[in-house]
């Protein structure tokens, strides 16, 4: 275990799972819940929200626009055999943790040359650069530590120039009626409100995927209809800008 001083003792379902069909939560989401660009940051999410998402996976009301992606496929699969008691235990644990700032957002027209390392982008390290285009490219600052499940891993998220200003206007003001101010539901500091999750400081790759899934009917569980209305008038560049701005904030 990397940093046992960073978190309370791990419940069995987080540390070991339940063989043969329930993976350890901490393997993918790390011991204190930060996850990575490929999946969710669970640290500090409301307990009721985590439980609801597991229910949505199980009932088929939380799916993905890319059905072949491994992380959501695993979540849908393990939502069937995992017990309600294990979900309750994991949700209690992760909701008790404090999220950490781990993402630096950099606006740029070009980025270090990249390749796909498993489920994430990684830097080739050759000194070459490539155009960013209309993408978010989120790279572990130390790939080996990230792949070794270090929960203190940090990331650099490259976003197109102008994303932060545009995203800030959409998030804080609704973009002149294009959407709803995020603080309306997610709290004045965007760190959550009641059963609704904090969205400040979250992975921009992950947030973009969720906005896209809400907008295309792949998330239809509780509260999802409200989000579908929020993203209804947004195009992908708007979603990218929102995700970039949110990632730049302290969680």
Language-model-derived ranges and their functions:
Residues 26, 43, 76, 183, ...:
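Cys/His/Pro-rich metal-binding microdomains
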Residues 165-172, 180-183, 188-191, 195, ...:
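Long compositionally biased, domain-poor regions of proteins
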Residues 41-48, 199-205:
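Short cysteine/histidine-rich metal-coordination sites, predominantly Zn2+-binding motifs
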Residues 31-32, 188:
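Cys/His-rich metal-chelating microdomains
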Residues 1-27, 31, 62-181, 216-251:
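Flexible coil segments in periplasmic/lumen-exposed cytochrome c-class electron-transfer proteins
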Residues 34-38, 193:
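Acidic/histidine-rich, surface-exposed loop or edge segments in extracytoplasmic proteins
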């Amino acid at each position: 275990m990397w940093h046992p001083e960073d978190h309370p003792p791990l419940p069995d379902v987080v540390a070991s799972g339940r063989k043969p069909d329930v993976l350890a939560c901490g393997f993918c989401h790390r011991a204190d819940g930060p996850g990575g660009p490929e999946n969710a940051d669970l640290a500090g999410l409301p307990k009721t929200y985590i439980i609801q998402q597991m229910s949505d996976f199980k009932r088929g009301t939380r799916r993905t626009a890319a059905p072949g992606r491994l992380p959501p496929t695993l979540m849908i699969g393990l939502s069937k055999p995992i017990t309600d008691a294990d979900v309750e235990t994991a949700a209690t644990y992760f909701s008790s943790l404090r999220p950490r700032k781990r993402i630096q957002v950099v606006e740029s027209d070009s980025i270090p040359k990249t390749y796909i390392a498993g489920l994430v982008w990684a830097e080739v390290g050759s000194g070459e650069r490539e155009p960013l285009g209309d993408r978010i490219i989120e790279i572990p600052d130390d790939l080996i530590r990230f792949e070794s499940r270090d929960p203190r891993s940090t990331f650099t998220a490259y976003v197109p120039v102008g994303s932060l200003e545009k995203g800030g206007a959409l998030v804080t003001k609704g973009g002149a009626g294009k959407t709803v101010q995020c603080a309306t539901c997610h709290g004045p500091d965007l760190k959550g409100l009641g059963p609704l999750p904090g969205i400040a400081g979250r992975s921009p790759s992950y947030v973009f995927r969720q906005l896209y899934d809400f907008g295309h009917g792949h998330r239809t569980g509780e509260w999802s209809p409200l989000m579908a209305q929020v993203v209804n008038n947004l195009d992908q560049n708007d979603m990218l800008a929102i995700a970039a701005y949110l990632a730049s904030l302290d969680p």
